[in-house]
Design a protein with these regions (language model features):
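Positively charged n-region of N-terminal signal peptides that target proteins for export
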Residues: 1-5
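Bacterial N-terminal signal peptides
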Residues: 8-20
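Residues embedded in well-ordered secondary-structure elements
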Residues: 15, 96-98, 152, 248, ...
Length: 403
């Protein structure tokens, strides 16, 4: 069957290639990548007072959706580039086969809305890449199944498939929340889901929580930071897709590891060349309201008195996903669950986000460790410098060491 990528991903959802799609100029570098149109779903467009996801879709036009897109990164190709597995020269997408096999404790993904085909899609994705099914459970944050929200199933598929791909031995929870759809919510229901996610992870041996959503920073955001402090849990959050200078919460919270976005440059043969900042995409900057945490004292000359994000980064574009058909998706929505899974697979779980971040910045302060444990991202924007920067933090993962 020949269908468009967007149509396959949005089957049953009120968005098609013929619709008028708003593109956020700050979210992406233009409206195409590798010659393909970028589609920013409604749920990924920032609006005041509304949480949004951080992903976009690559429209490959009419193509067969019964196999992964040939230019979409796979678990094996990404793991090869980041030296998480024994790889082949060039880490080509087509021939990289070795996938991560680790994972400890639990991983909880926080998303909005029900995803009816989650288990089937996760199984299909895993089978395609030689990944065992593992232990997967869907939890309703308030005890009741939420409605299906337009476009959020793509986010949920991306999150669970890639967290599981990086750490298949970890128990995986998908915590589904309702959304606040009016101005009458005292507290967005998503925060209850974050609380539930932390409790689930803590009860299952500790681990990580990944959040691929956010909202533009606002003056009262600090009152919600306590939701990311459950003992035994490290929280990861997307830094946003608004480019440098656009910071979001919870990504700006000092209680999360903020994950920014990069891009793999490949040659005409599909071999990896280098990694750069995803220009105009990965969110980063200095928080408007969060004070600089002590673990960032090592970069105080850069960030001043406020929190700087991201802390780390991972590939931003683009990932193979399965949602009743294969597609290609990008954004820091991919970066966050990927990095969370890598930390789980590293097997040295910390007792809190602060402990994880303290370790990361201590390693950054040690030039030898920083070079050994992270890829310093210095290309893609004039603000990408040697060392920590608002492009990619301390860098992207290099092996499991120091994670």
């Amino acid at each position: 069957m020949r269908v468009s990528l967007a149509a396959s991903l949005f089957a049953g959802i009120a968005l098609s290639l013929g619709a008028s799609v708003s593109l956020c100029s700050a979210q992406i570098n233009g409206s195409t990548i590798n010659g393909h149109r970028i589609i920013v779903p409604d749920s990924s467009i920032p609006r005041p007072g509304r949480i949004h996801t951080n992903y976009f879709i690559v429209d490959s036009g009419a193509r067969n959706n019964d196999a992964p897109p040939p230019d979409a990164e796979t678990p094996a190709s990404l793991a090869c580039v980041y030296k998480l597995v024994k790889g082949t020269k060039g880490c080509p997408i087509a021939t990289s086969k070795n996938v991560p096999t680790g994972g400890v404790g639990a991983i909880a993904i926080v998303d909005a809305g029900d995803y009816p085909t989650a288990k089937q899609d996760l199984h299909t994705f895993s089978s395609q890449f030689g990944i065992p099914d593992g232990d997967f459970q869907i939890v309703y944050a308030d005890g009741h199944k939420p409605p299906v929200y337009s476009n959020w199933e793509v986010e949920e598929a991306l999150d669970i498939e890639w967290a599981h791909a990086m750490a298949p031995k970890a128990k995986l929870f998908l915590v589904e929340s309702k959304l606040c759809t009016s101005n009458k919510c005292n507290t967005d229901p998503t925060w209850q889901a974050v609380k539930v996610a932390g409790e689930l992870v803590a009860k299952n041996g500790g681990g990580v929580v990944s959040m691929s959503f956010g909202d533009a920073e606002w003056a009262q955001e600090r009152q919600f930071d306590h939701y990311m402090t459950t003992p035994g849990v490290v929280y990861f959050a997307a830094s946003g897709d608004g480019g440098i200078g656009f910071t979001i919460h919870p990504g700006a919270s000092p209680n999360v590891v903020a994950v920014g976005g990069t891009f793999f440059n490949r040659d005409s043969n599909g071999d990896f060349i280098n990694e750069q900042y995803y220009t105009g995409g990965g969110g980063g900057g200095i928080s408007l309201y969060e004070p600089r945490p002590s673990y960032q004292d090592v970069i105080k000359k850069i960030v001043g008195s406020k929190r700087g994000i991201p802390d780390v980064a991972s590939d931003f574009c683009c990932a193979a996903i399965y949602l009743q058909g294969w597609g290609e998706v990008g954004g820091t929505s991919w970066s966050s669950p990927t990095f969370a899974g890598i930390v789980s697979a590293a097997g040295q779980l910390k007792k809190s986000s602060k402990d994880e971040l303290t370790m990361i910045y201590k390693e950054y302060a040690n030039k030898q460790q920083h070079k050994a444990y992270f890829n310093d991202i210095t290309q893609g924007d004039s603000r990408c410098k040697v060392g920590w920067d608002v492009c990619a933090g301390v860098g992207s993962p290099k092996t499991y060491a120091g994670k």
